[in-house]
């Protein structure tokens, strides 16, 4: 079907009703042809008196009536006397209000804006405007119309006004000059625009496909893209091959560009087992810092723990049970070693061991900081230990000054604690762990707790796996399932999954079930379980208690399709219920939503009065209210309320169904795991294991038995390129460890 043609209106901006300067979303009135029209859309920056041509469509807003939703907007500098006066009187420029606008018009008439742009010294003829003020007025005028010019320029390359504004903020008034000289700057930090946009601009300027800027940008983009997939580095040959396939240039040409990047230290190279690995500099620095600090902790003399065995016996008498041999070993090492990895599957006593260590540390009056990578994991750690726990970000105190993430606690402002216990270690990426260990005092110890069989972090690195693989950091792996945990089929089957043994079938009173289904029938089954069967049989709240965890986003049982179906079933569109459209998503009051990328600036208010900042990837909440006028939403996440303005709605996704990857560090009362259609690259044991172990009271696997068998039979973990194990071994050679 042919795309419907956009309607067009033109006229003069009469009034600005609403403006968001961060993302360029505006609501304004346009007067033309004797009609005043309310226009809304992301248009950049407009002011009263400007001439505009808007293209889009009329929409009927439930609250505000008929509006014109602009998808494109062209502007022109005010030209006639009335429009020039309206612009000056709108207070768009510093030091100029209605009275000063009258004086400027009296002196310069319709040429006033030409004077401001090209001969600001003449403004000093106006009483009250000094030479300094005249220069400031010109600077703001050029900034305003420079941004407008850039928005129009980049629009021809399909770059949105919002992204164009980001480009202007990055490069300033010289943005067009910088981009025309090297369009591939747009693909780098911090913008990371799509490579095709840069290619379009480069073709416009007749730049060759094998120019140095394009080759170097392709190498950097390939490394950044793979960092997003978890790799901290890539083998040289794989980097060249991947970049070659991406931009269709021979590897030989890219090799020359790579050598130049290494020479200028834009990229770094390390040799591991005779193979050169290429790094982005910040990721190599992160792994080197981690290796150096862990080696220092391991080399440092052990701590004395007088009467430790007696104190463990007293704990056993107090608790009314005896610790298993491996638990005792872990407790002893936690009290004597400067760093320790404690790992094990569900039901093996990690929490019991950590609580014992906490009690002994507190008996010695040691200051302990408990932390985890996500808010949900920190909350769970607090519940399990009965002590305050925080996210790593909260512990270090995020500082987002100037749009750059840093932490108040760092190597110059160390944490005031003696021991850090870090839970869910498998989720921690290299940059965050680098920041944490940098903030530890020389005498501070660290205990890293996690399940090595779970999926690695969403961000780059595989820290827990690499530390264990190095064999050089003290590690205790708990492997005994305790009696109370054996009553749970969730726990029992989790261990069957890891060992590759057949799953145990659940009976009526069990907590694990497999329901066979396929395709659209599997989708209907999942929806029926969420909306009807589980709430009726177990009393679960379908939104707050039940979580669908999907291996993939695509297909009938992927997150995208299931969220559409579940939203329509659990929270359908209703007259009078506010909703917002953001890209392809519709948000309604009552929807379950998830934060999908870190926002270090968003303000939250805790119910009870405390205020703070930050929402992090994986945080889940409920939409409490929607303001359709300014397109903002209030979301409640546990005991916090956050206001999401229009420009931040892209950080949220509907979350009735989420991916297994996004569920890391969380637990849910009931989990439904659809495995009817799983792409081969996601068909592996660790992903299935991670999904099952997110369930606290009930786990239902719905899908095909052959898919389950393939997942359990595929022991391939997601291969992640990382040099941390090699760097640790270089810092702490095995023979030195054995000699000690």
Q: What are the roles of these predicted feature ranges?
A:
Residues 4, 25-31, 38-39, 47-58, ...:
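Accessory alpha-helical DNA-binding modules that contact the DNA backbone or grooves
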Residues 356, 360, 364-366, 372-384, ...:
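Conserved helicase motor core of SF1/SF2 NTP-dependent helicases
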Residues 342, 370:
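Hydrophobic anchor at the beta1->P-loop junction of P-loop NTPases
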Residues 5-20, 56, 620-624:
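Structural detector for short beta-strands of small beta-barrel domains
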Residues 155, 214, 224-228, 269-332:
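Pre-P-loop entry segment of helicase/translocase ATPase cores
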Residues 452-613:
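Conserved helicase motor core of P-loop NTPases
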Residues 19-29, 629-634:
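Short aromatic-glycine-enriched beta-strand elements
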Residues 607, 617-740:
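C-terminal accessory regions
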């Amino acid at each position: 079907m042919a795309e419907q043609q956009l309607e067009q209106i033109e006229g003069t901006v009469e009034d600005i009703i609403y403006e968001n300067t961060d993302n360029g979303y505006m609501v304004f009135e346009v007067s033309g042809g004797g009609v005043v029209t309310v226009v809304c859309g992301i248009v950049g920056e407009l002011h009263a008196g400007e001439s505009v041509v808007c293209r889009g469509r009329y929409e009927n807003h439930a609250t505000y009536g008929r509006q014109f939703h602009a998808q494109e907007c062209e502007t022109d500098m005010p030209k006639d006397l009335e429009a020039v006066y309206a612009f000056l009187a709108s207070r768009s420029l510093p030091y100029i209000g209605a009275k000063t606008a009258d004086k400027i018009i009296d002196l310069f008439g319709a040429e006033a804006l030409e004077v401001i742009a090209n001969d600001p010294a003449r403004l000093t003829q106006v009483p009250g405007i000094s030479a300094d003020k005249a220069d400031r007025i010109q600077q703001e005028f050029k900034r305003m119309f420079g941004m407008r010019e850039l928005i129009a320029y980049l629009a021809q390359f399909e770059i949105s006004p919002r992204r164009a504004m980001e480009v202007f903020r990055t490069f300033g008034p010289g943005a067009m000059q910088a981009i025309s000289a090297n369009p591939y700057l747009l693909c780098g930090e911090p913008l990371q625009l799509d490579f095709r946009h840069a290619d379009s601009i480069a073709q416009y300027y007749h730049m060759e496909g094998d120019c140095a800027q394009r080759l170097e940008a392709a190498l950097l983009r390939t490394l950044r893209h793979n960092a997003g997939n978890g790799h901290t580095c890539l083998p040289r040959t794989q980097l060249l091959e991947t970049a070659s396939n991406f931009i269709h240039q021979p590897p030989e040409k890219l090799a020359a560009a790579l050598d130049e990047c290494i020479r200028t230290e834009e990229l770094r190279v390390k040799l591991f087992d005779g193979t050169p690995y290429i790094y982005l500099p910040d990721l190599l620095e992160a792994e080197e810092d981690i290796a150096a600090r862990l080696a220092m902790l391991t080399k440092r003399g052990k701590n004395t723990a007088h009467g430790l065995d007696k104190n463990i016996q007293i704990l056993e008498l107090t608790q009314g049970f005896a610790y298993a041999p491996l638990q005792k070993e872990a407790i002893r090492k936690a009290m004597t070693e400067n760093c320790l990895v404690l790992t094990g599957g569900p039901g093996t006593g990690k929490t019991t061991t950590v609580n014992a260590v906490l009690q002994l540390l507190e008996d010695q009056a040691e200051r302990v900081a408990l932390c985890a990578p996500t808010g949900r994991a920190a909350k769970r750690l607090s519940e399990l230990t009965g002590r305050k726990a925080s996210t790593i970000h909260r512990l270090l105190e995020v500082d987002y000054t100037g749009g750059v993430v840093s932490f108040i606690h760092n190597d110059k402002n160390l944490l005031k604690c003696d021991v850090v216990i870090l839970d869910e270690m498998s989720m921690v990426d290299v940059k965050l762990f680098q920041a944490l260990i940098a903030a530890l005092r020389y005498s501070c110890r660290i205990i890293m707790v996690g399940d090595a069989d779970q999926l690695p972090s969403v961000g780059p690195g595989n820290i827990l796996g690499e530390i264990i693989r190095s064999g050089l950091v003290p590690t205790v792996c708990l492997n005994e399932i305790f009696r109370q945990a054996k009553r749970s089929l969730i726990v029992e089957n989790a261990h069957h999954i890891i060992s590759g043994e057949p799953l145990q079938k659940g009976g009526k009173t069990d907590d694990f079930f497999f329901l066979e289904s396929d395709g659209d029938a599997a989708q209907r089954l999942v929806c029926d379980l969420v909306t009807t069967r589980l709430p009726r049989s177990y009393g679960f709240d379908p939104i707050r208690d039940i979580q669908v965890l999907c291996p993939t986003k695509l297909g009938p049982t992927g997150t995208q399709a299931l969220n559409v179906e579940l939203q329509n079933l659990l929270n359908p569109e209703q007259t009078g219920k506010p909703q917002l459209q953001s890209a392809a998503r519709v948000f309604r009051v009552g929807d379950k939503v998830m934060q999908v990328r870190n926002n270090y600036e968003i303000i939250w208010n805790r119910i009870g009065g405390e205020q703070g900042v930050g929402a992090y990837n994986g945080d889940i909440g409920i939409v409490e209210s929607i303001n359709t006028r300014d397109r903002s939403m209030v979301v409640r996440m546990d005991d916090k309320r956050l206001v999401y303005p229009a420009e931040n709605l892209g950080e949220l996704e509907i979350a009735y169904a989420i991916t297994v990857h996004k569920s890391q560090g969380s637990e849910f009362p009931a989990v439904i795991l659809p495995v009817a259609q799983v792409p081969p690259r996601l068909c592996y044991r660790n992903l299935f294991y991670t999904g099952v172990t997110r369930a606290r009271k009930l786990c239902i696997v719905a899908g095909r038995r052959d898919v389950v068998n393939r997942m359990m039979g595929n022991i391939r973990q997601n291969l992640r390129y990382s040099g941390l194990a090699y760097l640790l071994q270089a810092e702490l050679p095995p023979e030195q460890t054995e000699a000690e």
